[in-house]
């Protein structure tokens, strides 16, 4: 029921919110353990300022304006390497196709809490070609109209770094192929 086409920036924002809260908790734990409150506040404030800056950068990458330089892609990967703790089973509540992809790469739910990367290209983000591979490649036996299209490696790739790292515009190779395939069909 909750599966819709939506902007996943909201999901990413929530992960940043978790890290923000973790910075608050770490500060309170340090102070409760006898650390200098002013120094601890400085650490927390610096961490939270970095989180604000990192999220603003990720959000800007999501808009898909100008060309995304190598340095920007490297920064996305650096930001994405931060971790957070997931306390709920990620197998629960999934639609059948998504659950099938997840079970193919992770038949057993990992022990909880599970450490997750802030931004990730996970195996279950990739939708492989199956029997629905369109007959538009030059040498495909069912290509009756002589199309010569290059199929991307996957039918769809929902990887977060893969999508945020699009160099120009907002379409992945998979998205662009799907549009062109609809045109020729």
PLM ranges: what are they?
Residues 1-185:
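Histidine- and acidic-residue-rich, metal-dependent catalytic cores
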């Amino acid at each position: 029921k909750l599966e819709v086409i939506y902007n996943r920036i909201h999901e990413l924002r929530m992960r940043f919110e978790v890290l923000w809260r973790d910075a608050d908790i770490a500060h309170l734990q340090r102070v409760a353990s006898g650390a200098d409150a002013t120094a601890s506040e400085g650490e927390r404030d610096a961490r939270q300022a970095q989180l604000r800056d990192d999220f603003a950068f990720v959000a800007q990458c999501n808009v898909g304006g100008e060309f995304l330089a190598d340095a920007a892609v490297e920064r996305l990967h650096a930001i994405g390497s931060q971790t957070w703790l997931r306390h709920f089973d990620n197998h629960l509540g999934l639609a059948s196709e998504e659950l099938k992809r997840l079970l193919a790469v992770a038949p057993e739910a990992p022990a909880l809490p599970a450490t997750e990367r802030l931004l990730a290209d996970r195996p279950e983000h990739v939708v492989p070609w199956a029997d629905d591979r369109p007959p538009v490649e030059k040498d495909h036996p069912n290509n009756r109209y002589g199309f010569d299209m290059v199929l991307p490696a996957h039918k769809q790739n929902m990887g977060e770094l893969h999508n945020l790292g699009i160099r120009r515009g907002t379409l992945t190779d998979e998205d662009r192929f799907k549009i062109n395939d609809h045109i020729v069909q």
